[in-house]
Regions:
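C-terminal structured domains
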Residues: 433-434
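Positively charged, low-complexity/disordered segments
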Residues: 1-19
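Gly/Pro-rich cap/lid or specificity-loop segments adjacent to the active site
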Residues: 23-247, 370-388, 392-403, 408, ...
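Alpha/beta-hydrolase fold active-site neighborhood
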Residues: 244-389
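Conserved strand-to-loop "acid loop" that flanks and positions the catalytic carboxylate
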Residues: 412-417
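Aromatic-residue hotspot detector
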Residues: 5-10, 338-341, 463
Length: 470
């Protein structure tokens, strides 16, 4: 396999910021998930991709530990399909961690500056079957293999070649994969809103997230009771009138339900209220341009097709038959392939989420097959999306036995009201994964790390100090 190639660019302000580019094998993640033979026999075995990481460290000379001696910590972004945050104005958690660590903002493969995927370059690799084989190479196993390649280069001159991780949401899922496949590389791990539901089935995951979204809708309507009638009226209007988004496609009632993304965070619900109140601002017979423009921004996957394409695959942990020849001793996981459009199947059993229900309920992080009919940016990917949903031979995402005996210190924040990563499932995972310690909150939502990062970092720091002092 092709080795890692490394390039970098450095700039100095109040922070030292170094941009790194790595050339890594496209298929090396399969070694973790399916075995070395699978990586070598893939039709893509001789190809490489570019992985980008930005390193940030405070140059404040009053800090206790000099910049060159600080330990490394890599940030694992939520998603899937989103790049790491940019550093135009450094503050919040990045600034805080940069005082004590060299912070690595890794763009996961297929996102940001790391060989980003689009409908154009996915369809260019071949027919739908080839596309499915290609996109399989952008899951957690490959992201962790990339992180290992980055670590080996950046920490090459360190006596202790371990680094720490901090993962938000999907970044927590990645953390559990990292602890499965390369625990020897990790000093300690921090997880926020990302204790993945590894011990249950994908259908059970969605049953719980629909339950949480129903509760969140009820809470929202208790704050803005007039919006229950307004949202239902908008949905009825969309069934009887043709309304078009700025990109030219018709807005449907079930696509309008995607505005539930506003309810995923602690402070965005007021944004949903302001959004809804503009719907008939121009008159009662049509939806306003400002409403349709805002709606268009909410429902398009133009910038992040990987999120839609790969979202359910983050729950496909291993093959349907439980057989992985390249992984000795592999046992069938609690959530094997296929996912088979799980969210859509669960939604069909929940009439209260029907778009023509007496009172409209908004959906959350749920991917439906009709996305690929109604979103122009996803239409070219419809066939490969179906193949991924039906795929039975996924590699493993986790080594459950390794996680159960884990010794790497893990500190996590889990939130009772989280509508995307269910609290009950998170606590089940925490009980399974060894040496895991959880701080819980009844007031933070899924975006807690974004809206209250320093508070949460403080709790994690204190827990980690207690663990290291034991």
């Amino acid at each position: 396999m092709v080795g890692v190639r490394f390039f970098f660019f450095k700039q100095k302000t109040a922070y030292e910021i170094t941009d790194h580019w790595f050339q890594v094998p496209l298929t090396h993640g399969l070694i973790f998930s399916k075995g070395k033979d699978a990586a070598l026999s893939s039709r893509f075995a001789d190809q490489t991709i570019t992985v980008f990481a930005r390193e940030v460290v405070s140059t404040n000379e009053t800090l206790t530990v000099s910049a060159d001696k600080r330990p490394y910590i890599v940030y694992l972004q939520g998603g899937p399909g989103f790049g790491s945050p940019k550093t135009g104005s450094i503050g919040g958690w990045i600034a805080e961690l940069a005082k004590t660590h060299r912070v690595i903002l890794l763009d996961q493969r297929g996102t940001g500056m790391s060989s980003p995927l689009s409908a154009r370059n996915i369809t260019a690799v071949g027919d739908a079957q080839v596309q499915a084989e290609y996109t399989e190479l952008f899951r957690a196993d490959s992201i962790i293999a990339d992180a290992e390649a980055v670590r080996e280069v950046l920490l090459a001159d360190r006596a202790d070649k371990r680094w720490s991780t901090i993962g938000q949401s999907f970044g927590g899922f990645l953390t559990l994969s990292y602890l499965s496949f390369a625990p020897q590389s990790l000093r300690d791990c921090r997880i926020t809103a990302g204790l993945a539901p590894i011990r249950t089935s994908v259908d059970n995951v969605y049953q719980h997230t629909f339950d949480r979204m129903k509760e969140r809708n009820e809470e929202y309507y208790s704050w803005f009771p007039e919006d229950a009638e307004l949202a239902t009226r908008i949905a009825e209007h969309l069934r009887t009138h043709k309304e078009y988004l700025p990109t030219g496609e018709r807005l449907t009632d079930h696509r309008f339900q995607m505005a539930g993304h506003f309810l995923g965070g602690r402070w965005r619900e007021r944004g949903l209220h302001y959004f809804l109140e503009t719907a008939f601002a121009e008159g009662n017979d049509h939806l306003s341009d400002q409403f349709l423009t805002a709606m268009g921004a909410e429902v398009t996957f133009q910038a992040n097709p990987l999120y839609a394409l790969m979202h359910e695959t983050i729950y496909a942990d291993g093959p349907a038959d439980g057989v992985l020849p390249g992984i000795p001793g592999y046992e069938l996981s609690p959530s094997p392939a296929p996912t088979n459009w799980s969210a859509a199947r669960v939604a069909a059993s929940r009439p209260e989420f029907a778009p023509d229900a007496d009172r409209l309920l908004f959906t959350g992080e749920h991917i439906f097959p009709w996305y690929y009919e109604e979103d122009p940016s996803l239409r070219p990917l419809a066939e490969v999306a179906n193949l991924l949903a039906e795929k039975k031979d996924w590699g493993r995402l986790y080594d459950h036995a390794q996680l159960h005996k884990n010794e790497v210190p893990v500190v996590a924040a889990a939130y009772n009201p989280d509508v995307y990563v269910d609290f009950e499932h998170s606590m089940e995972t925490a009980r399974w994964v060894g040496n895991t310690h959880v701080w819980t909150s009844k007031t933070h939502h899924h975006d807690g790390f974004g809206s209250d990062s320093l508070t949460i970092l403080g709790h994690l720091k204190n827990m980690l100090a207690e663990v290291h002092n034991q």
